Amino acid sequence: MTESHIDFRRAKFLISAPDIAHLDQYLPGDVGVEIAFAGRSNAGKSSALNALTEQKSLARTSKTPGRTQLINVFELDSQRRLVDLPGYGFAQVPLAMKNKWQQALGEYLQKRACLSGVVVLMDIRHPLKDLDMQMIQWAVASEIPVLALLTKSDKLAQSAKMKTVNEVRKALADFGDWVLVEPFSALKGTGKPKVLSILNEWCHPQWLRDELDTAEQSN
């Protein structure tokens, strides 16, 4: 079966949920394909989502990091969704709330069967903090591929940018093919075609291809 191209510009807001338990209440079960976006509260997650979907306000950007406490779900089509997870690791958030978020993030990564890939966004100037590594480890332990996206790459000169990209790739090399590392700039559009190509591939996991092949053969 030929792999179709997903038009990420068609993404539209579906629901918000305070945690994974409520997510199951709002969505039609743990089915279809989900791609999650996770990152520290200042990693530029909302800006990246808006740039990738070419929508200025699909994901609301906040001038106060740590404000996004909800899981926000955006629908690509009847089978595919983008999931904007709460930002983590912001110092001004109360410890109890911070721990609750981190527990919810871990639950989502470990228990969500329809999760096809995770984009872990990191400011290219401050990559691989402890919580970033924890997110990557959780995902890989659950056999979920990861795209480590180094955001705000326009903030560095080309030589410094590639030096950081290579250092991060080396640091994550033990994860093998489970983790890809790419630079990205929401402002300049740097890396956008590569990221969309990876997301498109994740939108077509093998189980879905097999399911569609079976449906085609029965018609």
From Swiss-Prot:
SUPFAM superfamilies linked: P-loop containing nucleoside triphosphate hydrolases
Pfam families to which the protein is assigned, alphabetical: MMR_HSR1
Record-linked InterPro entries: G_ENGB_dom (IPR030393), GTP-bd (IPR006073), GTP-bd_ribosome_bio_YsxC (IPR019987), P-loop_NTPase (IPR027417)
GO function terms (MF aspect): GTP binding; metal ion binding
Annotated GO CC locations: cytosol
The protein's required cofactors: Mg(2+)
Amino acids binding Mg(2+): 46, 68
GO biological-process terms attached to the record: division septum assembly
HAMAP family: GTPase_EngB
Family listed: Belongs to the TRAFAC class TrmE-Era-EngA-EngB-Septin-like GTPase superfamily. EngB GTPase family.
Name the record gives this protein: Probable GTP-binding protein EngB
Gene: engB
